[in-house]
Design a protein with these regions (language model features):
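Vicinal oxygen chelate
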Residues: 1-26, 36-55, 59, 69-79, 84-85, 115-150, ...
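N-terminal beta-strand motif that seeds the catalytic metal site of vicinal oxygen chelate
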Residues: 7-45, 50, 101-104, 149
């Protein structure tokens, strides 16, 4: 790719290095969103008409009381989530503001370290179905859940 932007100045290089060394900067990679929907099958069917195919079959996540199915949209995954049962974070999001984003998903290099770091900052970890992910209730701060995956 050809860039028309001039090379970074010495000051810009130093500024970037300083900011990257900050303890709150992390190497998380944004990989997708969880979307609260009224019907996983209808949402997946609609996206299929747009040319986006499911990356998995619908499944039930008993720890978060929801049905989910992922769709690859370019480099991101849209995971459609439908509440199942009464105590569902997804259902809470639907009741509060209707269909839309309720979960931000990031890939991390060391799940145990990042989980410990977030818990040390006071974030509440909520149940997840496997050892490859950790969910945090950040609704008070950002009106979404935060999910880290290994």
């Amino acid at each position: 790719m050809i860039s028309l932007r001039p090379p970074a100045t010495e000051w810009e290089v130093a500024w970037k290095a300083n900011n990257e060394a900050h303890p709150l900067v992390n190497d998380w990679r944004f990989i997708g969103v969880g979307l609260a929907v009224n019907s996983v099958s209808e949402a997946a069917s609609y996206y299929a008409t747009l040319g986006f195919e499911p990356i998995d079959e619908p499944s039930i996540d008993t720890s978060l009381s929801m049905q989910r199915q992922g769709i690859q949209v370019g480099p991101l995954v849209f995971e459609f989530c439908q509440p199942v049962g009464k105590n569902s974070y997804c259902g809470d999001a639907l009741n509060r503001r209707g269909e839309g984003v309720f979960d931000l998903v990031f890939q991390v290099k060391n799940l145990a370290d990042e989980t410990a770091r977030l818990e040390s900052h006071g974030l509440k970890k909520i149940a997840c179905t496997d050892e490859q992910s950790a969910c945090f209730d950040t609704r008070a701060e950002g009106n979404t859940l935060l999910r880290l995956v290994a």
